Structures are given as structure tokens and as C-alpha cells.
Amino acid sequence: MRKLKKYKPTRFMTKTSHYDKDAADYAVMFIESLCHTKGTWAGKPFELINWQEQIIRDLFGVLKPNGYRQFNTAYIEIPKKQGKSELAAAVALLLLCGDGEERAEVYGCAADRNQAKIVFDVAVDMVRFCPALSKRVKILESQKKITYLPTNSSYQVLSADVANKHGFNTHGVIFDELHTQPNRKLFDVMLQGSGDARMQPLYFLITTAGNDTNSICYEVHQKAIDIAEGRKVDPTFYSVIYGAAEDEDWTDPKVWKKANPSLGITVGIDKVKAACESAQQNPGEENAFRQLRLNQWVKQSVRWMPMDKWDACAFPVSEDDLEGRICYGEIGRASCRERV
């Protein structure tokens, strides 16, 4: 297990904020008192990997002068199989049971209820593995709701039609796989003002890169880039993006390691290698590998021809050399009625 050896507060911490080690230690201790719930890890203590602990200490330990958290929105973008669901479930339980908030409302959101249920189900199993929480929590599976009895707080999965509703008094939102959102309606309902009555709400957005640059996820992704590069300022916004640069060699194991901070722990390098070799032999898999394994934003999920091979066809051709040769024509019948 790769542990965080020496913590250094995020560069997004403002000059007026401070790092409260006790608050951060408490958050880490709460999460590490939980257990993993799946596969060979099931029942074992949830020991935070170094990158996970960095995020938790930044979010729960960086406080404003009034003692409340500086960051209200966290955007975590990372490849698949890095432990996203477990981290999101642990954060949900911390906001529900360990944040000292009376009648806290924590919501699980995703493109559909089944997707949101993934994190919820992990949280339910974490509760069942933890005797201290089990006797203080009521689980309503049929409603996809967990109630923490001492503070009458709840964590609930929302249905798809919630985008047409208002009136939430949000303390926490766990937004899983933001890149799959078909539009921005649910995002706006849950993040625009729903937590204004709370002193330190946390909107925890965790996702893999997508393939739609017109989506709400790409909008948030671009905001994260703009803040990191100094073009925008938002002291309440925190982001971490793990991935490969567009011009990096996607077949290089060093690039895999850079993009996958849990490589060798939650996912074996042999699995990534096999997926890469398959993508090299089957060009249609390349974009999926780049998107899901390297967290690169791609223009489509399946590519018929690698762009380097397409670009290699851009050489001058003499029409005289083509005279007398067979010519092929093509028409594209797309939904927008374009003609090629």
C-alpha cells in the first residue's frame, strides 16, 4: 500500500485559510475505520492510498478563518478501477455520520438511478461491516436511503426525474461519473443554491473523462484546467485530474503509471497491458483505452481508424497519376442529412 509520507496542503489553499491537522486526522480516521466491501479486499480496513489521503486532508483539513471548510466543490477526474466508488461511498458516510451536521441531507446522483446505486450499495456494505455504525444507522433498501439516527440525517439515491424538482437543503452531493450526464439539468438543481442554507456543504464530483466536449462534465473539467493554469479564480473549487496528456505515448507503461495512481494496488499492470495490446490490434478499441484507462477526453468512444494513420494519408497527389484508375464515391447518410 502506498501511504502518504508527508502531507503538503493543496496549492489552492488561500492565504487566509489554514490547515487544521486535527480536522484532517479525524476525517482520515473515520474513513479508515471502514472496510472494503468487494473481492479479495472485502472485510479488510479501508486504508487510504496516498492520492486518496491527499484529497481527504485537503477537503476536510483546509479551513477558512471562521472554522468552516474552504472547499465546497471537489472535482476528481481519474481513470477507471482506481477506487472511485469506495472513496465516494466513504465521503458520503463521513458527511452523513461524522460531520456533526443536524438533519444533514446527502444525495447520490448519476446519469440514472442504477448508476447512483453503485456508490450507495458500497456505502450500505461499509455500514454492515462496521458495528459502530450498524447500531446507529437504519437502512431502507427499497427507498435506497440510509438514515443516521443520532442526527436524523439521511443519504439517499435520487431518481432521474429529480431534475424537475427543487427545495433541497443539501449538505452533501456525491455525483458519480459526471461525464455520463445527458444534460446539465440535474447538475444545476443539485449544485446551484441547494446548499446555501448550510455552512459547509460539499459537492463531491468524481468521474472518468468522457467523449462529449459540449457536456456539463467537460465544462467543469475546463473550469478545473482554467483555475489550475491561473485563468480563473474560485477559492471554493478543488480539483484533481489524473490522466495522460494528449501528445503522450498511450502504449508506454510510464504513461500508464502516471495516469493511474492506484496501479498495482486496485488494478494490476497486467490488466492494463492486456487492454493496450488488444487496442493496438483492434483500432476500434483505442479510444476506449485512452478514455477509460488513461483518462483522456476523446471525440468519440469508438474510432474506426487511428488518427495518425489518417493523417499519414495527407500527401500531395497528382491528378495525372490517377487518370484511368478506378474511382470510388461515397455518400454519408447522417441524421443531419449531410452529403459527402
Explain the meaning of each model-derived region.
Residues 331-340:
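Residue-level detector of conserved catalytic or cofactor/ligand-binding positions
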Residues 1-331:
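Phosphate/NTP-binding elements of NTP-utilizing enzymes
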